[in-house]
Amino acid sequence: MAVTRGFTGRDRRGGDDRLPPGQYDTGAGWPTLTAELTPQVDVDTWTMTVDGLVDTPTTWDWRGIHALPGSSYFGDIHCVTTWSKFDTTFTGVSVDTLLEITGVKPEATHVFATSTTGYTTNLPLADITDGKAWIVWEFDGKPLTPEHGGPVRLLVPHLYFWKSAKWITRLELRDHDEQGFWERNGYHDRGDPWLEQRYQGDA
């Protein structure tokens, strides 16, 4: 497991209504913790696929996804390892835009996200639609770095950050839930930071 700098300077900010329970403000830092080696993804060969229970399975290459209408997220992110980072800006494309192109079959209820490394995570469909999720390639106006999931990652900022799969390459829509990597290893199936859904059995 790789750990990088940023797990210092803890500010608990008691009473701050932007800080979920059990979290600390990481300030200017952005800690990283991964269960695998950081890949160097080539944008010339990278693709993003949305398939499964959709009307039109679609794959975009790097140029193709950049040609879609852009969208940005400004707000906070929260990691299950207890850090939170305020006032982040990510730029990319809304997942809603991708699903408008592919269509969604009525029986779809969940999404299984897969990274180029084989990492997986599961999400309810409701957690990536209606302006809640993005495919992003910029952070604060600069290309997303590999250790933070670059060149492109999933962003689901209202859930703990392991749900925002780094090095994303596929979203498969399904009619059932299936646990991903961390979920199979004891982490919560949904991961709402405001409910402290860190581990299996949490509310």
Question: What positions do the PLM features span?
Answer:
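Structured, non-membrane catalytic/scaffold regions adjacent to prosthetic-group chemistry
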Residues: 2-203
